[in-house]
Amino acid sequence: MGRFIFVSFGLLVVFLSLSGAKGNNCPQDWLPMNGLCYKIFDELKAWKDAEMFCRKYKPGCHLASFHLYGESPEIAEYISDYHKGQSEVWIGLWDKKKDFSWEWTDRSCTDYLSWDKNQPDHYQNKEFCVELVSDTGYRLWNDQVCESKNAFLCQCKF
């Protein structure tokens, strides 16, 4: 009987340690999702400066890219919980060629888009970088002048 209890307790410890792991190596205050970690930074930066900040934070980091509709609600909730300001939030999508051919800075496939109504519009032929719109609960996107200053969302693999 004592051996049974000892083995059962040992299996319980192993199970609890494995169930808590989930392959999540994200630091505190980062959102783990689909094998990546996401963090909102409230410091206001131009789009290129935000991308450079993410890259310098850790090799392989970039402004965030999204590939599934299902990611939007979780990201939006995380930003609403942790973003201290009211600004829009830069993500890693941009129109490098200025011809409505949108690309992610991490060079991943542009297979999902979530534009706000009447967007993108390249307003006055000046908007080539993409932000999450605060008025939509950070669920929809707008193209914006890249030199505008926004908070930003980095994604990293730890």
UniProtKB/Swiss-Prot annotation:
Expression by tissue: Expressed by the venom gland.
Domain (C-type lectin) ranges: 33-155
Any single GO CC term annotated in Swiss-Prot or TrEMBL for this entry: extracellular region
Signal peptide location: 1-23
SUPFAM superfamilies hit by this protein: C-type lectin-like
InterPro entries: C-type_lectin-like, C-type_lectin-like/link_sf, C-type_lectin/snaclec_domain, C-type_lectin_CS, CTDL_fold
Main location: secreted
Molecular-function GO term, any one: carbohydrate binding
Disulfide bonds: C26-C37, C54-C154, C61-C156, C129-C146
Record localization: Secreted
Keywords, comma-separated and alphabetical: Calcium, Disulfide bond, Hemagglutinin, Lectin, Metal-binding, Secreted, Signal
PROSITE patterns assigned: C_TYPE_LECTIN_1, C_TYPE_LECTIN_2
Function, as annotated: Lectin with a hemagglutinating activity that is inhibited by galactose, lactose and EDTA. Is calcium-dependent. Shows effects on the renal function of isolated perfused rat kidneys by increasing both perfusion pressure (PP) and renal vascular resistance (RVR). In addition, the urinary flow and glomerular filtration rate (GFR) decreases significantly.
Assembly and oligomerization: Homodimer; disulfide-linked.
Family, per entry: Belongs to the true venom lectin family.
Protein's name according to its UniProt entry: C-type lectin BiL
Organism (species): Bothrops insularis
Organism ancestry: Eukaryota, Metazoa, Chordata, Craniata, Vertebrata
